[in-house]
């Protein structure tokens, strides 16, 4: 694609992002950080941009910032809950389905910068991709304005869902399966990535879940995390004989 086309797409993104931040009641300093947060690797590949200009590094950072923010929120809100309960609650809040809820609620999915092929194959509605962008956005917000602003964003976008019990239907199967195995004294659970296939912008991961040294289920997903969730879901339903 041409440089002119790239410039048009980026300028359109920047205008939409500026409008979105105004709607949310936030300002920003470094627009380049947010552009990177919304740049999927397929977009970078289509325009032959620097391979590190996609959002994966910011996603890595945002994941940690999000866990810290949610941990502090739960620690303050539930002073009498033990560590195990807090961990379970945090897992529900920061799991992929929850992040998709947060992102879609404020329309972040509409602004993702995708390559032509990824757009055609439904990348804009893919849960793993949306949740990754949400984490990358949190990473960019942290670098641009600090933890206090991340906290204010969470107060507006994340915590209300928690307080209104809107995440009760979200299932973190890895946590559920781990707890079930522990209750049944069935040993340790581990996950192995057994296959990774497809082009860089459209990867498919296959993971297996190991219990007592035996592979008992497999799962596929667009990310390693998603494939492990699907494997855990299959194993959990298999052991509990849920259809």
Curated annotation (Swiss-Prot):
Coiled coil: none annotated. Its EC number is 3.1.26.3. SUPFAM superfamilies: dsRNA-binding domain-like (SSF54768), RNase III domain-like (SSF69065). One of its GO terms (molecular function) is metal ion binding. It catalyses: Endonucleolytic cleavage to 5'-phosphomonoester. The keyword Glycoprotein does not apply. Keywords: Cytoplasm, Endonuclease, Hydrolase, Magnesium, Metal-binding, mRNA processing, Nuclease, RNA-binding, rRNA processing, rRNA-binding, tRNA processing. GO terms for cellular component: cytoplasm. HAMAP family: RNase_III. Belongs to the ribonuclease III family. This is Ribonuclease 3. The lineage of its organism: Bacteria, Bacillati, Bacillota, Bacilli, Bacillales.
